[in-house]
A protein has these predicted regions:
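Second-shell loop/turn segments in exported
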Residues: 1-2
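Glycine-rich active-site loops that engage anionic ligands at enzyme catalytic sites
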Residues: 5-135
């Protein structure tokens, strides 16, 4: 995975503080081909490098942007297909802070479809936010 530290420095910093991360990953109900895990950064991460149109391999951070509070819902996710990001209240911005290289998209699709059909799976992230590349 390529970390987009120049494009989303506050996001990379906030998410990087949670690593190593272990939690359950689930398939999205609203944004299509997306696998996500709920997190809690304890920070008010700003919109940066944000979009509502994701591409395969995009690694994103989402929060309830409209709530100016510390106890909002937050998630990290990876997309295995192009999608419009949305929530039950409509389109939602996400911060793109990483990209999985195209050579791994088939594996992403396989994992995403398996989670979609069979349910959540344990997710472990061992990436070091100070590195430009993550395994």
């Amino acid at each position: 995975m390529t970390i987009l530290g120049d494009d989303a420095p506050r996001t990379v910093e906030a998410v990087g503080k949670l690593i190593p991360f272990s939690g359950m990953a689930y398939h999205s109900r609203w944004s299509g081909r997306e696998v996500n895990a709920m997190i809690h950064t304890g920070e008010r991460v700003p919109l940066e490098n944000h979009t509502i149109q994701t591409a395969p391999g995009d690694v994103i951070y989402w929060r309830e942007w409209e709530r100016d509070a510390d106890d909002v819902s937050e998630a990290i996710a990876v997309y295995y297909g192009a999608e419009l990001t949305r929530f039950h209240r409509g389109e939602q911005f996400v911060n793109v802070f990483g990209r999985v290289s195209q050579e791994h998209w088939d594996l992403l699709r396989e994992i995403g479809e398996r989670i979609w059909r069979q349910g959540g799976e344990r997710l472990e992230i061992l990436w070091n936010a100070s590195q430009e590349q993550a395994p």
